[in-house]
Amino acid sequence: GNAAAKDILTSYSIAEFFSHLPEIEREIEVVTYIAGEGDISTDLLSPGNQAHSRADRELHAKCMISEKAQSEIKELQKKNPDKKVMLIAEKGTMGVGSSRMSGINNVALLTGKKVSPYIPFVNYAPIVAGTNGISPIFLTTVSVTGGIGINLKNWSKKLDSKGKPILNNDGNPILEQNYSVETGTLLIINTREKKLYDKKTGKELIDLSDTFTPQKVEFMKAGGSYAIVFGKKLQSQACSILNIPLKKVYADSKEIVLPTKGLTAVEKIFNSNLIDKKHNRKLYAGSDARVRVNIVGSQDT
């Protein structure tokens, strides 16, 4: 056969396109920007009444939050050219709602990195955070862009002597501030220690183990989860063509095994198409696995 083609396939079979990428930075310095108080809807980041402009990324980005907010973010970037802006939902959850992809695209365009100097208006690796974390489905979309989503836990409920929340006159829990993230605060994300630090005092603020799981770090390293998905597909295909075993390159998959429980129809489809079957164990919902794709379905389109 063709020697050059075999060299390429051999490289693909050990996923050199991924393993040769540089690791993510050890420390990421950020400057905070409070996008709003309470839960932040994706409609604030990508308004539904401007949906007609979503195909034009440059135009659609102009409707994120407000012109005033965009000017303030750009001013922060001018004052802190070596730092990334962290968009925050103070006392709430970031990214509730359904316009998640266009929403995170707008955040990335304003605060992320350029994918390429030759591709205009496509950025990646935004950093978003919320006092109560990130909405689960929005967090998945953050991973699509190779971004970072942080549960700040910078406010907590004030408790009485019995450990029960103290309520105000409106019946809502009284909150106590654990640390401040007011606009302009300088923080350091240490990706190796998986900690968040106050840059000014050096004080450790929170643990970030949930933010930097092995799988999420891979998404950040590759520039997004799609790159990992397609990379695994390339590796599997190359190994199949060369008729060699699949070499471990990526982080271990999460496996959920419930020996006494039956399988749903969807679980049966996935199990019958597993590429790397181990000990004939059946995997259940919540597992990560490589599968052969031979069916396409759609949820709502």
Listing of model-derived features with the role each one plays in the protein:
Residues 1-301:
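Fe-S-dependent hydro-lyases/dehydratases of central metabolism
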